[in-house]
Amino acid sequence: MSAVKNAEGTQKLSVFKMTWPIFIEILLQMMVGNVDQFMLSHYSQHSVAAVGNANQIINIVILALSVISMAATILIAQHRGAGNREKVAEVCTVALLANMVFGVIISAALFIFDGFFLSLLDVPSDIWAEASLFLRYIGLFIVVQSAYISFISFFRGYSLLKITMITSVVMNLINIAGNCILIHGLGPIPSLGVLGVTISTNTSKVLGLLLILYFFHKFIDIRLSLKYLRPFPKSTLYKILYLGLPSGGESLSYQISQMVIMRFVNVMGIVVITTKIYAYIIAMFSYIYSQALAMATQIIVGFLIGAGDLDAVEQRVWKTIRIAVTISTTVTLLLFFNSDSIYGIFTDNPEVLELGRHIFLIEVFLEAGRAVNMVMVMSLQAAGDIKWPVTTGLVSMWSVATLGAWFFGLHLGWGLVGVWLAMCLDECLRALVFIYRWKSEGWRKNNLLE
């Protein structure tokens, strides 16, 4: 009965109160990468293209690290809903260990084999050196990022979302200050360009990790301990991987498909490359609040399922979808009607401005589908319904988005407009499939706590 009461209390919490700190946190996390490119845009367009290409690989790595962390957040929320504090501590310990091991391996791979990864993108020779520099030295600090992402997931599972927001604010301020000094130089400090970006970005990550460790010991009432690893809790690791690998596969598949699409774009010339990169940065403002809504809903869904209140889950998910679609569509329309002014922040190139207008007309429909997908995927994950998101994602992302980008963009010669049309069709098709799955109520049959 106490679990049900706890669930009712959680349901009464304003989703807005959970969403806005997540929104600010995600915005600032994305800005760590995008601020780099914005500030570099006043230094060199080639540097923007170099960092944009390297970030395609970094984004895949971050998503791979988020696989375990996302699963940890769901399990923490469910065990909290069921009132099992010891299991929460065990999940946190196992998740951190797994992510740290993975982080060390990835850091070494990116530093040593940077050339191999860049060749997969067919990076142009005139931006290769800067892309390699950025990938190697940002990659070297991925192990720091893996620990940071793990602790962020613990705070989300505990619904302590303002803490993660504060940490992101501090990290972003450090990164911006470092860029201001190091990109163009200041006084005796020379202009370092892309190297300066890597220094300020990595410094902000290290200090961010130290801050989140302090907050963990101050605000969370569990302690990580080796006792939870003796004997090793294979069942807990299995549940983390059961949730994380397929769920992460959906996101990972998306990023890999985007990497292939970037390869198509790279043969279209520097104007198209920079337009795509700027469009991605601007598009972030269309979907970021919907992503925050989806993440807040995932935490609530996990808690409610742990408490056994499935009817409340149903109501919460549909309400979130309506809000997410409305907000994403409204913001994208505003961006479309003001596209010249917004692109003008980055460049005055008339070719980029014209191409950007065409892209954002398609973006209106793309973002409506993406809003549905984000809420549905995270809700299905929280319910333990893992196979549908990853299967649908794999099929649609590759057969519609990637193949379509080649067909419309290169084969028919529609360029970046054709690429965006294919990605729009992918998002809308997946949205319809996920709506069908949720209405079938197959998600109600899963139980991760047994």
Model-derived regions: residue spans:
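Alpha-helical transmembrane segments and their lipid-water interface positions
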Residues: 29, 33-36, 40, 62-69, ...
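Transmembrane alpha-helix boundary and packing residues in multipass membrane permease domains
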Residues: 22, 26, 37-38, 74, ...
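Short alpha-helical transmembrane segments in multi-pass integral membrane proteins
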Residues: 1-22, 76-143, 189-245, 301-366, ...
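Short runs within selected transmembrane alpha-helices of multi-pass transporters and secretion channels
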Residues: 69, 138-157, 164-172, 197-212, ...
